[in-house]
Structure formats: structure tokens, C-alpha cells
Amino acid sequence: MLNRTKKTFHSNILKQDYEYCVLTSDEETEEAYLLHVQDGKDYLELGELENAFQNLLEKQPEIARKLVFILVHPGNSMDRWNAYHHKGKKFKQYLTFMTEEFLPEVEVEIGRKIVRRGLLGDSLAANISLNIAGMSPETWTHLLLQSAAVSEKDIEMVEQLKHVQWLVYQTVGKYEDEYVSLLTNENLYILTRNRELHEMLVKKGARIVYSEQEEKHEWRFWKSDLMNALEFFLFTS
């Protein structure tokens, strides 16, 4: 059985409330494998994350019950772009909010020994996850990046890091260079940028499972790939 608790967090930095969920098994453990999920509502509704979690509990109960998901959602499409894209009005503030307000307080509330700490995101949610990790690289053990909508500037952020020890699961579709943003009408060249990001992460010392699949930039792809990403988080060390 799963426990899903819906909560609200008020940010003094952004002066607004954010809804988030805590998802765990009903068997509490002393240790936690903590996974922070951006686009949390989409992962629940479109990615069917709860089904994937339940499958993991049935297959590997001893380790899967250590999983704790923190699923935060940025709001509507424009809120998301402003928070997750480096050109967004709230991008820098959102990074500060996550690293200085949200993450510390939420993790104290969990009350467990955190032995793994990861970030999961799709598209722009993967981009903000990468940037959150870049704020304090030593804090994170795992990054799960599904079709990360990164720009040259985000790759430059990684280039500025001295060295990382991240374990990275990175997937992208072979047809994603064709994707055009519905908000900005610009081509994001997602496949090309992911190849560049992969090279930079390797250069910086990350250990990576990288794959290009016969897919487009859509939730059907990320949903089908989600179990692989979660198993990487659980079993790769």
C-alpha cells in the first residue's frame, strides 16, 4: 500500500504557495532513498508514478520501501516556464527557493536518515533539476533526466563545475530535435543539446547511463521509461 500526503509550502522568497505531495510505502524505514520530483502532478497523472512505485514494491519490497518521493508542481504552463527556464522571470528565485527554503525544511519533516538523494524531471523539469543539482553538487547522488530541455547556457553551468560524482540516468528521443516549444515557438534542439550535455557530464566525472530511443518529446515516452529510471535510482551506486 502507498501513502500519499498532499501539502502546501509557502515561499517567502517567491511570496506564493506551492502544492506538493509526499509519497511513501506504508512501511516506514529508518533509511530513505529520497527522490525530489519536479512536474510532480504530471508524474502522478500522466507518468503514472504510483503504479511504477507499486510494481517496484512487489518486485523488490525490501529496498523499494525505502523510497520517499517529494513531488512538487510549479503551477500552470507559464508558471512552469518562468520557474524552470533560465530566461524565466522566476528562474533564479526558484533555484534559491528550492535550495534554501523547500529542500531543507521538507527533509527535516521526513525524519529519516537520507542515504540517497536524487532529482527526477522531464523536459524543462529535468532542466531545473540539473540546475538545482548544480547549486550544491555534493548534495546529490542521482539525477534522472528524461528528455532534458537544456540550453547552451545550462550546459555552460555544468562546465563551470569543478567535478561531480553524480550517477546520471539520461534518456532522449531520436526525433526530439523536431520539437518546437508551444510557449515560445522556438526549436529547442533537445536531442542535440542532450548529446552535448552528456559529453560535458562525462568530462566532469559523472557516471552515466545514456540512451537515445525511437521516441518523440511526449509523455508516452517518459511514462514507458519511468520504471527504468526508478530502478537506476534504487540499484545503481
Which sequence ranges carry the predicted segments?
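Non-catalytic cap/lid and distal C-terminal segments of serine-dependent acyl enzymes
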Residues: 1-237
